[in-house]
From Swiss-Prot:
Annotated keywords: Autocatalytic cleavage, Cytoplasm, Decarboxylase, Lyase, Pantothenate biosynthesis, Pyruvate, Schiff base, Zymogen
Gene3D superfamilies assigned: 2.40.40.20
Chain's gene name: panD
CDD domains: Asp_decarbox
UniProt KW Cytoplasm keyword: yes
Modified residues (Pyruvic acid (Ser)): 25
Family from the record: Belongs to the PanD family.
Protein name: Aspartate 1-decarboxylase
C-alpha cells in the first residue's frame, strides 16, 4: 500500500509579492527550499492563514537569502502580499518509507528567515503563540479548572 504523507512544510511564511501576470507557481527563496527539501517544479499546497484559501501550484527557485515568497499567476487573486501562508509538500511513500521517513518542518520569522527546524508536523516553537494538538488536553484541563 502507498500512503500520501506530509513531506515538508514552511510554516507561517509572509507573502512578499503577488503577480497576476505571470505564468504561475510560487517563488520561494532557495535557502527555504533547501531547508524544507523542496525542488524546483515540486508540487505544493499553499494555505493562506489570513483568508483560508487553499491552492496547489509548483515551486520556482527564488534568490538565495532574499526571503521571497512570491505568489504568481491566477493564485494572486487568492493570496496577497503580507498574508501569512503555509507551504506543504506531500510525498507518496510505501509502508517501509513511511516508517523511516521524517518530514522537514520549517518555521520562519516575519522576514522568512528559518527560526525553527524540525520533523514533528504538530510542533509549535516555544514563544510562537501557536497551539499544538498535543496541548489540547492541557488547555481543556486549564479551562475546566478556571470554570470551577
Amino acid at each position: 500500500m502507498f500512503r500520501t504523507m506530509m513531506k515538508s512544510k514552511i510554516h507561517r511564511a509572509t507573502v512578499t509579492h503577488a503577480d497576476l501576470h505571470y505564468v504561475g507557481s510560487v517563488t520561494v527563496d532557495q535557502d527555504l527550499m533547501d531547508a524544507a527539501d523542496l525542488l524546483e517544479g515540486e508540487q505544493v499546497c499553499i494555505v493562506d492563514i489570513d483568508n483560508g484559501a487553499r491552492l496547489e501550484t509548483y515551486v520556482i527557485a527564488g534568490e538565495r537569502g532574499s526571503g521571497v515568497i512570491g505568489i504568481n499567476g491566477a493564485a494572486a487573486h487568492l493570496v496577497k502580499p503580507g498574508d501569512l501562508v503555509i507551504l506543504i509538500a506531500y510525498g507518496v511513500m510505501n509502508e517501509q518509507e513511511v516508517r523511516d521517513y521524517e518530514p522537514r518542518v520549517v518555521f520562519v520569522d516575519a522576514a522568512n528567515t528559518p527560526v525553527d527546524l524540525g520533523a514533528d508536523p504538530a510542533h509549535a516553537p516555544e514563544g510562537s503563540g501557536l497551539i499544538t494538538p498535543r496541548m489540547l488536553s492541557t488547555l481543556d484541563a486549564e479551562r475546566e479548572s478556571s470554570l470551577v
